[in-house]
Amino acid sequence: MSQAQFSHNQLYCVDIIKTYKPDFTPRVAFILGSGLGALADQIENSVAISYEKLPGFPVSTVHGHAGELVLGYLQGVPVACMKGRGHFYEGRGMTIMMDAIRTFKLLGCELLFCTNAAGSLRPEVGAGSLVALKDHINTMPGTPMVGLNDERFGERFFSLANAYDAEYRALLQKVAKEEGFPLTEGVFVSYPGPNFETAAEIRMMQIIGGDVVGMSVVPEVISARHCELKVVAVSAITNMAEGLSDVKLSHAQTLAAAELSKQNFINLICGFLRKIA
């Protein structure tokens, strides 16, 4: 298959990024979900680039997603940090995060650290909790890999076994214990959105083994594993899923509730980076 038939956005993005931050090779790429952008404020020697300047990056239409890439150092580790992501429901399909993920691969990243705000399917895991993801169930339509396979990045058929790296999860657990807060592990259920799930759908998700539900994560994780980036992911619980509480779900409520876990979230990530530095 001719490479001319595939996007070169990733190559353009690498060139653009290197004009802003020459001789910089990030080890870890972060994707920060709704209300979780405060982590980027901790980055030192930082440079910020609007997604509008990066071909193929998702120009977000969602409040709480700043839409910029921040490059710099966090706990001494070179990082690339997406303040906001694209979602399937914004109209670009399951490939909305693919160019960004492949750009990180070409930049030299070894690990994708994915975060998101999510609803809990477990009554004992309430708002303010953090959940390290150990697997996912995809209820979105298809995957980012549908269509011609770009062999520059990975093989047509690939495994999602240990997609959420077990060794890195163990390291997160160690950090949480040291910091003195619980870190639950769970299975993430993806949902297309933008409407929230029905109570009947939530009951189904519980039956099939889900622990948390959200409208992101899966497209970028599949894209990352296709190009052999390791993945670790943490959900910040902002609400009980529909039918499990009397709270009316809204995006404003999600943003407000993200504040409950903000400090533990920052401490977890900074502690994790110190251990891999």
What do the predicted segments below correspond to?
Residues 175-211, 269, 276-277:
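Active-site/ligand-binding-proximal alpha/beta "capping" segment
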Residues 141, 148-194:
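Histidine/lysine/aspartate-rich catalytic loop segments that bind and position anionic ligands
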Residues 215-253:
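Zn-dependent metallopeptidase/amidohydrolase metal-coordination segment
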Residues 110-111, 211, 230:
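Short acidic/polar active-site loop segments enriched in Thr and Asp
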Residues 242-277:
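His/Asp/Glu-rich mid-to-C-terminal helical/loop segments that flank catalytic regions of hydrolases
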Residues 2-160:
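Metabolite-binding pocket within alpha/beta catalytic cores that recognizes anionic/polar moieties
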Residues 16-23, 167, 171-181, 267-275:
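Generic non-transmembrane alpha-helical segments
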